[in-house]
């Protein structure tokens, strides 16, 4: 790899995809163990493995891009295509949850009382915490765009300020969502309403946590002067992902919270 005469990055063998897959297996198995047997051992093991994998994989990517110069324009182009395909796959992932929701709500079965929300379910008021959550995420979309424009103009301080605001709003959203779950008058086991509500909003919440982590990494990288106005794909990918999370929430809010209530 040291003496390459082409613009492409031949990646060195890495253990992180394997440990990442192992952590995913441990986390999903751990969730089942937690739900059914109230044991969090596997889940904690999975989360720890996942955190270690993320740290070391990100460290390697930063080393390759910033310090070894492997991310040439051709490589960045490939990474952009990869990120676009990843976001498309995420769109299809959430399509499944919306499909389940509309399949259940547009033609409620007699078991549900022939109505939606099902008999006995008291839905959350869409004009309370969900509306606040919507405004928080929309504001974070504005601040991430401000950060991007500041980076393009070479204004480092404004970029850091805007990025910090975005991260703070992302954390605030997560805390609001957690409090809403804690106070919700129904649970994930309350029939198809509880299942579709908690799975769809829960996976969105997980994506907000992933996006916030991505932005925190970008924040620390910017503190170390890793980004320039012409070389910042790591931040660009995080911004694309954050906008995707924003748009998914708008669909969730309109479908599940507002129309579905």
UniProtKB/Swiss-Prot annotation:
Keyword check for Mitochondrion: yes
Family: Belongs to the cytochrome c oxidase subunit 3 family.
InterPro entries to which the protein is assigned, alphabetical: Cyt_c/ubiquinol_Oxase_su3, Cyt_c_oxase_su3_dom, Cyt_c_oxidase-like_su3, Cyt_c_oxidase_su3-like_sf, Cyt_c_oxidase_su3_a-hlx
Mitochondrial matrix side: 1-15, 67-72, 153-155, 224-232
Cellular component, GO, one term: respiratory chain complex IV
Role of this protein: Component of the cytochrome c oxidase, the last enzyme in the mitochondrial electron transport chain which drives oxidative phosphorylation. The respiratory chain contains 3 multisubunit complexes succinate dehydrogenase (complex II, CII), ubiquinol-cytochrome c oxidoreductase (cytochrome b-c1 complex, complex III, CIII) and cytochrome c oxidase (complex IV, CIV), that cooperate to transfer electrons derived from NADH and succinate to molecular oxygen, creating an electrochemical gradient over the inner membrane that drives transmembrane transport and the ATP synthase.
Membrane topology: Multi-pass membrane protein
Protein name: Cytochrome c oxidase subunit 3
CDD domains: Cyt_c_Oxidase_III
BP GO terms, sorted: mitochondrial electron transport, cytochrome c to oxygen; respiratory chain complex IV assembly
């Amino acid at each position: 790899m040291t003496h390459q005469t082409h613009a492409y990055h031949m990646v060195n063998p890495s253990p992180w995809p394997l440990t990442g897959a192992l952590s995913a297996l441990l986390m999903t198995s751990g969730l089942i163990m937690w739900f059914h047997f109230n044991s969090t051992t596997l889940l904690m093991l999975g989360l720890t493995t996942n955190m270690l994998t993320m740290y070391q994989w990100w460290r390697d990517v930063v080393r390759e891009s910033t310090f070894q110069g492997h991310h040439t324009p051709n490589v960045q182009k490939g990474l952009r295509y990869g990120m676009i395909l990843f976001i498309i796959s995420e769109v299809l992932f959430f399509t499944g949850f919306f499909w389940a929701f509309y399949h259940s709500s547009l033609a409620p079965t007699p078991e549900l009382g022939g109505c939606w929300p099902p008999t006995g379910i008291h839905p959350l008021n869409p004009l309370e915490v969900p509306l606040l959550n919507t405004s928080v995420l929309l504001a974070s979309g504005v601040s991430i765009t401000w950060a991007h424009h500041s980076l393009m103009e070479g204004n480092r301080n404004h970029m850091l300020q805007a990025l910090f605001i975005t991260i703070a709003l992302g954390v605030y959203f997560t805390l609001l969502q957690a409090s809403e779950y804690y106070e919700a008058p129904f649970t994930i086991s309350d029939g198809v309403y509880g299942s579709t509500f908690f799975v769809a909003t829960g996976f969105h919440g997980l994506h907000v946590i992933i996006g916030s982590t991505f932005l925190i990494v970008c924040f620390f990288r910017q503190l170390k002067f890793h980004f320039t106005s012409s070389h910042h794909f790591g931040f660009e990918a995080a911004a694309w992902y954050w906008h995707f999370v924003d748009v998914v929430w708008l669909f969730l809010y309109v479908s599940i919270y507002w129309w579905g209530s």
